[in-house]
Amino acid sequence: VIEPDCKKYEGKKCPPDIALVCGTNGREYYNECALCVFIRDSTLKADKAIKIKKWGKC
């Protein structure tokens, strides 16, 4: 399990590149930034604890 490096995306738009990540919630995100945006924008406490389960498809 990998901690996403969300600090590097603060105040920036996500890059358009596709580098799939599989979250510990079982959902796929098109890159690490997209996962960080989901974590940031979620109001659910459980979503704040999502990590990267693995790089690539779930």
UniProtKB/Swiss-Prot annotation:
* Keyword annotations from UniProtKB, A to Z: Disulfide bond, Protease inhibitor, Secreted
UniProt-listed SUPFAM superfamilies:
Kazal-type serine protease inhibitors
Q: List the disulfide bonds.
A: 6-36, 14-33, 22-58
Spell out the subcellular localization from the entry: Secreted
Write down the InterPro entries for this protein, in alphabetical order: Kazal_dom, Kazal_dom_sf
Q: In which tissues is it expressed?
A: Skin.
Q: Which residues form the Kazal-like domain?
A: 1-58
Query: What's the protein name?
Result: Proteinase inhibitor PSKP-2
